[in-house]
Regions:
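Structured beta-strand/loop patches that form or line metal/cofactor-binding pockets in enzymes
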Residues: 1-40, 338-345
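N-terminal amphipathic alpha-helix/helix-capping segment at the start of soluble metabolic enzymes
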Residues: 1-16, 103, 107-120
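Conserved, mostly hydrophobic/aromatic
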Residues: 5, 31, 55, 93, ...
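Shared catalytic-loop signature of beta/alpha-barrel
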Residues: 25, 53, 69, 220, ...
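Metal- or metallocofactor-binding catalytic centers and their adjacent structured scaffolds
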Residues: 28, 32-104
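Alpha-helical scaffold segments that flank or form the walls of functional sites
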Residues: 96-105, 136, 140-144
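Proline-centered loop/turn at the N-terminus of a beta-strand
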Residues: 108, 122, 201, 252, ...
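Metal-dependent enolase-superfamily TIM-barrel catalytic cores that perform enediolate-based chemistry
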Residues: 120-248
Length: 354
């Protein structure tokens, strides 16, 4: 039976003022549809326009089974490609088509991808404090909840909200002191190891807020804390510096949430300059390219740690989990935890879904 695409719709919502975008692909078979995550929270309206004005006219009438051909055609049809707007729009369609394929086959996504490699998915979450002691206490609370790997920060990502002292005589504005951030972070991890010993796995996210030369020093200084990984210590534009970091320390390195295309990750993987790939699935175009990235990483001993932030739809989180289940080189899954604002009668608890 040939099943074709009948309609493509975009659904936008903004829980807690976070712009989330979902694509719904409806088919010629009554009641058969698929959904996919297309969330680019900072430019969501551009993604909506890309789906409605450009992808939808092309997709109507296409066979839902031709996932690879549809993905390749959309990727190249705009000529200028590999940007976050088109990739997120493409992701919404791609995930929806995989969803349809799974429903037609009567199989979950992880079975379509080759079957389960594990029965559960280890996750890490975030502890962010305004002070060192605040963060230490939050790590303890998460430990009590059962987390065995925790990302710790003072002042949020890369210390962006950390108290600072503006330079004397400076103009009003925002100042960031990388040296103060580095020193405060080292103090934090000294306290964490002093308090919890080596029973916890710990991570840290620099969030690209260091100059390359400072990142080399910082990664070396963090080596003694035996991190599970140090995340995004460089911006994608400066990824050539990973070679210097690798030469100076053994701290495991994670990178990738801002990556859009293979040219950004290829050398890091084939040269084994990172340990974990951290891409945001919708940012690279969905499940179809993620499968290929998993296989590439597996060949070079790199493990996955997909980006799992709050600005991701539940569909995106579910896809992360399915890929984790089916990947032999799965490492760990970021989980931004849940914040239930309301619950409808009869709603299924999130832990029951996963």
């Amino acid at each position: 039976m040939r099943v074709t695409i009948r309609d493509v719709k975009v659904i936008c919502c903004a829980p807690q003022k976070i712009n989330l975008v979902t694509v719904k692909v409806e088919t010629s078979e009554p009641g058969l549809y698929g959904v996919g995550c297309a969330t680019f929270a900072h430019r969501h309206l551009a993604v909506v326009a890309a789906v409605e004005k450009y992808l939808k006219p092309y997709l109507i009438g296409r066979d839902v089974s031709d996932i690879e051909d549809i993905w390749q055609s959309i990727k190249g049809m705009s000529y200028w490609r590999n940007g976050p707007v088109l990739n997120n729009a493409l992701s919404g369609v791609d995930m929806a088509l995989w969803d349809i394929k799974g429903k037609m086959a009567g199989m979950p996504l992880y079975d379509l991808l080759g079957g389960k490699c594990r029965t559960g998915v280890p996750c890490y979450t975030h502890a962010e404090g305004t002070t060192i002691e605040d963060c230490v206490q939050k790590v303890g609370a998460l430990k009590e909840r059962g987390y065995r790997c925790i990302r710790a920060q003072v002042g949020g990502y890369g210390g962006k909200d950390m108290p600072y002292q503006p330079p004397e005589g400076s103009f009003e504005g925002c100042y960031y002191d990388p040296k103060a951030y580095m020193a405060k972070t080292i103090q934090l991890f000294e306290r964490l190891r002093e308090t919890y010993g080596w029973e916890l796995e710990l991570c840290h996210d620099v969030h690209e807020r260091l100059r390359p030369s400072d990142a080399v020093i910082f990664a070396k200084d963090m080596e003694k804390f035996r991190l599970f990984f140090l995340e995004d210590c460089l911006s994608p534009e400066q990824s050539g510096w990973f070679k210097q970091i690798r030469q100076h320390c053994t701290t495991p390195l994670a990178m990738g949430e801002l990556f859009n295309n293979p040219n950004e990750w290829l050398n890091l993987i084939t040269e084994r300059e990172i340990d974990y790939i951290r891409i945001h699935l919708s940012q690279i175009g969905g499940i179809t390219p993620a499968r290929k990235l998993i296989a590439l990483c597996d060949a070079f001993g790199i493990r996955t740690a997909w980006h799992g932030p709050i600005d991701l739809t539940p569909i995106g989180h579910a896809v992360n989990i399915h890929l984790d289940m089916a990947s032999p080189n799965f490492g760990i899954q970021e989980w931004a935890d849940t914040n239930t604002l309301s619950e409808d009668a009869g709603a299924i608890a999130l832990h029951q879904i996963f």
